[in-house]
Each structure stands twice: as C-alpha cells, then as structure tokens.
C-alpha cells in the first residue's frame, strides 16, 4: 500500500454520467489531494495531509512541485501496427487529388497493406512498441489497436499476433481489434461479399482459436464495403461472439444506423452523420467516437460532437493514429482542437478520453479516480487542470503511473 501525492488538484472524473453534456462545474476536484493505492488499485482519494495522518506508517510516493493528477487516458481507436509511410498521400491530397486518384496512383490503404505484408513480425513489433511508448508518454495507458493492413489470412494473423506479443513488452493495456474488413484486397478474386464471407469462414475462426481479438471492425463506405453486405457481415461476426465496432459515416451518411441496429459497441468517425442519425445514435448505447486526427489529416469537417452530446449521446474521442488519414498520433492536441471547433467543455473532452472511451472498449474498471478503479494516472506540472487542453498538447505529461507504478 502507498500514498501518492500531494497534488495541487486531483480531477477524479468520478460521479459523472456516461452520456450527454457536461459542464466543468460538475467536475470533482480534490485540492491538495493524495491517492492511496494497493495492489494496483485505488483504495481512496482525499486530502493528502488527512490521508497521511490516517495511514501514518504508509510508504509515500512524493510528488514534487505543483502538479495536477487525472485518470490516465484511453485511446479507443488506432491503427498503429503498420509498415511504411504515406507522406506522398499527404502531398497528393494537398495538390488536389481525390481519394480515388491517390489510390490509383499507388497510395491509399492498399499501399500500407503492401508495406505491412512485407514487414517481418519483428519489424512490426519494434515499430508498434515505439508508437505505444509515444502514446504512453502522452498519458495514454489503454490503447486499442486494429489489424486491417494484412487483408489475407497470413498477414491479418501476423498483425494480431504482433499486437498480442507487444502486450508482453508493455504495461499499457492493449485491446486488439480485427479489421480484416478494411478494404477488399486487390489480390482477392471475388466480390466484396465473397471477401466478407471469407473473413467469416477463414479469418475469424482462427482469430478466435488463437484468442487474438474479441472485437471486429468494418469500414462501411462507398470505397470499401456497402451497407447491406456490411450488415450481414456484422450479424455473422456477432453470431461468432465478437463485439462490434464500425468505421461509420466518414464521407457518406447511413452506416451509423447500421452500427446502432446491430448493437455495435461504438460507431467511429461520423464526420458526415446527418441530424436524424445523430438523434438515433445518441439515444442508443453505441458510443459515438470522434476522430479529430482524421479530420485534421484529411482537411475534412469535424464530427458533430456538440450535437451528439446535446442529444444525449455517449461521446468518446480517439486518435485514429494511422499512416494515411491521421499520422499525428497526439490525442491531446487533437481533442483540444476538437474542443475549440465543436465548443466542448473541458469536462466533455476529459470524459471523452477517459471513462467514456474506456466504456467503448468495455472496460469499466478505469477512467475515473475512485475506490476500486485501476490506478492508472497521469500528472501534469501545472496548478490548474484547465491548462492541459488550453496548451493544446504542448504541456507535456509529467508522470504516468500504471497499476500505481511510475513508468
Ligand atoms: O480510420 N477510414 C478508414 N480507415 C482509416 C484510414 C486508414 C488508412 O488510410 O490507412 C481511418 O481513417
Ligand atoms: Fe480508423
């Protein structure tokens, strides 16, 4: 057992609703606080001096200077297992080329597939670990990672095995997702419906047998998979007992409806979601995940986060870190920028990258600082929590704790 502190402020994010809008006045802030940790779990939060007096023999982990402590963040949507780089896509986009033109000139998702197929497991493991460490340094200790750059049995399994192996090298929690339905691979001879059936018959059973992922994702879009075939695929994946998440409404609306109808845990992107569908989504238990990094990467509009919250939806915010649409990999910067464009309160943003994004991954043991929760913490050297988003990511995390231990 040990006591961590003192903190100028502890922002616990406790006792807040899972859904809907939040104001900063609703935030519980413990000033001059301490956190009591036992076996990786929070036992108590409260006034540091009082806790020290109550547990006089206890080991102390002293915090220097004025610092603010929050629950560590959860990035619930990334594609950080990939080979190569797509800087040329960026140049082509800025020269006015369309998505299709870029794909035709050798860029796009398919080019990342070719690089990822070429990479060995060891090479992929090294790069994914570097990206994981970079996320940890931002205060993110729970990271979802998708496959989807293999797109055949061998390479999809390779990606998921790499993610599984990465877990044995990091204290961060990694949540793998099978995104074999990212795109119909160019070397698959058959229709996209046949490819989706191939995933059901040939990939998912192996994913299950090796326990490589419990979640299945699909990119529903004109350039990827159409709504009806996607719905059938998702229902079959559900029958195989996978949890569902969807790349929905990125450029065209309609697919968030499918996500809700099949009971997806989350619908992610939503840049193009129409008002009617926002209402539908917001009334459901499907988490609406904004990916501001993709809006910034592509120069597209932001997810209507304000409308989603006002309609009572569960809003998470994630980085979408990938080599194509979202190469930045800085969730704090992206979430801060989303706040300015969508007029979000600090409380709404912090909820979106802590307990609400953890909920999107079915992890209800983290994301707030209260008794019984996982002692994953992030601290910032500042006297006021508002400064974290105000500086748009340039105020760096000072300490990161996982299970109560500094990493
Ligand atoms: O979430 N939209 C589809 N998939 C990714 C992009 C992946 C890529 O371009 O490599 C996304 O933005
Ligand atoms: Fe994505």
Predicted regions and their residues:
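N-terminal metal-binding scaffold of metallo-dependent hydrolase/deaminase domains
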Residues: 1-54, 385-387
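Residue-level marker for buried hydrophobic side chains located in beta-strands
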Residues: 3, 72-74, 244, 317
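Divalent metal-coordination and catalytic microenvironments
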Residues: 7, 35, 40, 66, ...
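Metal-associated gating/positioning segment near the N- to mid-region
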Residues: 60, 67-127
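Metal-coordinating catalytic core of metallo-dependent amide/deamination hydrolases
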Residues: 112-127, 133, 141-257
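Active-site-adjacent C-terminal substructures of enzyme catalytic domains
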Residues: 243-244, 253-368, 380-382, 386-387, ...
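Short peripheral tails and domain-boundary helices/loops at the edges of structured domains
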Residues: 397-407
């Amino acid at each position: 057992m040990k006591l961590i502190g003192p903190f100028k402020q502890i922002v616990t994010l406790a006792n807040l609703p899972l859904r809907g809008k939040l104001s900063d006045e609703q935030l519980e802030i413990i000033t001059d606080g301490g956190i009591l940790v036992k076996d990786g779990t929070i036992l108590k939060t409260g006034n540091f001096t009082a806790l020290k007096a109550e547990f006089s023999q206890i080991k102390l982990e002293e915090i220097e200077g004025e610092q603010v402590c929050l629950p560590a963040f959860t990035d619930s949507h990334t594609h950080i297992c990939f080979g190569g780089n797509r800087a040329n896509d960026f140049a082509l986009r800025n020269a006015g080329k369309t998505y299709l033109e870029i794909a035709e000139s050798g860029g796009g998702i398919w080019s990342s597939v070719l690089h990822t197929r070429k990479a060995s497991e060891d090479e992929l493991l090294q790069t994914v670990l570097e990206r994981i460490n970079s996320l940890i340094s931002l205060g993110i200790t729970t990271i979802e990672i998708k496959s989807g750059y293999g797109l055949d049995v061998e390479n999809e399994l390779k990606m998921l095995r790499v993610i599984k192996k990465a877990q044995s090298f990091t204290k961060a929690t990694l949540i793998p997702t099978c995104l074999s339905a990212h795109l119909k691979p160019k070397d698959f001879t058959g229709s996209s419906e046949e490819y989706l059936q191939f995933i059901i018959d040939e990939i998912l059973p192996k994913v299950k047998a090796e326990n490589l992922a419990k979640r299945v994702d699909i990119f529903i879009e004109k350039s990827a998979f159409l709504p009806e075939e996607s719905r059938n695929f998702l229902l079959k994946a559900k029958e195989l007992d996978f949890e569902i998440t969807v790349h929905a409404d990125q450029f065209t609306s309609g697919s968030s409806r499918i996500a809700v109808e099949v009971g997806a845990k989350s619908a992610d992107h939503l840049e193009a979601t129409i008002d009617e569908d926002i209402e539908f989504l917001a009334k459901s238990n499907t988490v609406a995940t904004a990916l501001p990094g993709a809006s910034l990467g592509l120069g597209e509009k932001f997810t209507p986060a304000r409308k989603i919250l006002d309609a009572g939806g569960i809003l998470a915010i994630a980085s979408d870190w990938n080599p194509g649409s979202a190469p930045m990999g800085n969730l704090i910067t992206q979430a801060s920028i989303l706040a300015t464009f969508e007029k979000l309160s600090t409380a709404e943003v912090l909820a979106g990258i802590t307990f609400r994004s953890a909920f999107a991954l079915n992890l209800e043991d983290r994301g707030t600082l209260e008794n019984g929760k996982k002692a994953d913490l992030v601290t910032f050297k500042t006297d006021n929590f508002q400064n974290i988003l105000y500086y748009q990511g340039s105020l760096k995390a000072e300490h990161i704790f996982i299970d109560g231990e500094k990493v």
